[in-house]
Amino acid sequence: MSLSKLKAPKGANRERTRVGRGQGSGLGKTAGRGGKGQKARSGNMHFEGFEGGQMPLQRRLPKFGFKNVFRREFEEVKVGDLDGLSGVVDPAALKGAGLVRGNRDGVVVLGGGELKSAVTVKVHRVTAGARAAIEKAGGTVELIPAPVTMYEKAKAARKAQAKK
């Protein structure tokens, strides 16, 4: 048995059926589309949610919520993931260990799992449960300021301009 001798199971690769090629084929004349009507025509399909001219459900329901474009997104690390690390654990160490990618607005430690070794954790946010677990293991937590976003820089510049 080798890869070059493998074959697809019988019936797996079917030839494309050619429709509209005479009545003897079983798919002649209307080509499996039934009689007349919108669905029998080319370019027939109306858009998803169309209800025949009646106001569609997605337009009958009220709008709600919004997406905050200035929202800060933090990468999440669980306390249990810190167990293999030692010494000072900061975003650079977490990135080196492959626990975060480093492409968000900071790192937050969540309280899932157990920590057996004492570590100094320097991150942007820590939940109460995570802080308790780290301190129970004999470690310490230091909060570092989150990186300043482009929006915050622009806001500060506008504020400084208004004072002048």
UniProtKB/Swiss-Prot annotation:
Residues 21-37 have a biased composition (Gly residues). The keyword RNA-binding applies. InterPro entries: Ribosomal_uL15 (IPR030878), Ribosomal_uL15/eL18 (IPR021131), Ribosomal_uL15/eL18_sf (IPR036227), Ribosomal_uL15_bac-type (IPR005749). One of its GO terms (biological process) is translation. Keywords: Ribonucleoprotein, Ribosomal protein, RNA-binding, rRNA-binding. Residues 1-52 are annotated as: Disordered. The keyword rRNA-binding applies. GO terms for molecular function: rRNA binding; structural constituent of ribosome. SUPFAM superfamilies: Ribosomal proteins L15p and L18e. GO terms for cellular component: cytosolic large ribosomal subunit. Belongs to the universal ribosomal protein uL15 family. Binds to the 23S rRNA. Part of the 50S ribosomal subunit. This is Large ribosomal subunit protein uL15. It comes from Anaeromyxobacter sp. (strain Fw109-5). The gene is rplO.
